[in-house]
Amino acid sequence: MRVVYFGTAEFAVPTLEALLAAREIEVVAAVSQPDRPQGRGNRLTPPPVKAIAQSRGIPVFQPDRLRKDLEVLAHLEALQADFFVVAAYGQILPQRVLDMPGRGCINVHGSLLPKYRGAAPVQWAIYHGEPETGITTMLMEAGLDTGPMLKKIAVPIDEDITGEQLLAQLAHLGAGLLLETLREFDRITPEPQDDSLSSYAPLIDKGQYLVDWGQSARQIRNQIRAFYPYTHTFHRGSRLRLLAAELTSTGSEQFQPSAIIHVIKSKGFEVVTGDGALLLTRVQPAGGKEQPAWDYANGCRLMPGESLGL
């Protein structure tokens, strides 16, 4: 079975490794996004999928825009693959590419389709307080994550799990599900998606990391978990990342949202929200290290009555 693998992000690595370990599958090429500057030094860094593929001697193509790169398109066509497999690639495949493999294009998607079609399904599922999510393998078509579904696995969303942790969990489940899908492909009846049940999970905009203290305590906690480690507020003019929080029953009717009402020894500090209060337990100040919120409060002599967001 000849497979071309399309993937870029860390989420795509377990599926590639599973394909490489399967004796009946030959990964004949990988397609990934171009190297990008990363880190404080803006060093040009290869995507995780490229690094794995190159270490195994697999040809890697990195077109800026796949649909416009005629040379790469010609190479892909010449490979005569049975399947194209896609996981967290980052570009929409044009119809010409979808038509190339002999048996089809299969996508590994991090949600229970048709819910959360789009680029960030895991984070938005946590943000919206979903009790479960999962992995779907699907046949690809021109629409965004609209193709017929092949197999699914449902996973409960733990109350404390972050988007980063859930992505890693789903990535490994997706690898196994993809192998099952390929091996059982001829016996699977594709299931059309019900568009009336669909929802969209767009790319995360940096503005969505900023906390609005007028929201409910649960919603802010979901935001902290979903977008970990980037959710933040401001304190004394500097950004303060919020890394973990607990719901609390503390009343706060006499205070406005964003006010700090209690500093609790060895725990953290409570902040007024739109419907009560939230106990912050781990934070990271600008230019500093992740630390217990109590250590931060103690170090900067945090006082009840101060406000965050300023």
From Swiss-Prot:
Any one GO cellular component localisation term in the record: cytosol
Q: Which InterPro entries match?
A: Fmt, Formyl_trans_C, Formyl_transf_N, Formyl_transf_N_sf, Formyl_transferase-like_C_sf, GART_AS, Met-tRNA-FMT_C, Met-tRNA-FMT_N
EC class: transferase
The entry's keywords = Protein biosynthesis, Transferase
Summarize where (6S)-5,6,7,8-tetrahydrofolate binds, as residue positions: S111, L112, L113, P114
Q: Which GO terms describe its biological process?
A: conversion of methionyl-tRNA to N-formyl-methionyl-tRNA
Any GO molecular function: methionyl-tRNA formyltransferase activity
For this protein, the record's PROSITE patterns field holds: GART
| Gene3D superfamilies linked to this entry | 3.40.50.12230
Reaction(s) this enzyme catalyzes, per UniProt: L-methionyl-tRNA(fMet) + (6R)-10-formyltetrahydrofolate = N-formyl-L-methionyl-tRNA(fMet) + (6S)-5,6,7,8-tetrahydrofolate + H(+)
Taxonomically, the superkingdom here is Bacteria
- Which CDD domains has this protein been placed in? FMT_core_Met-tRNA-FMT_N (cd08646), Met_tRNA_FMT_C (cd08704)
- UniProt EC number: 2.1.2.9
What SUPFAM superfamilies is this protein classified in?
Answer: FMT C-terminal domain-like, Formyltransferase
Q: Which family does the similarity line name?
A: Belongs to the Fmt family.
Its job: Attaches a formyl group to the free amino group of methionyl-tRNA(fMet). The formyl group appears to play a dual role in the initiator identity of N-formylmethionyl-tRNA by promoting its recognition by IF2 and preventing the misappropriation of this tRNA by the elongation apparatus.
Show the HAMAP family listed in the entry.
Formyl_trans
Query: By what name is this protein known?
Result: Methionyl-tRNA formyltransferase
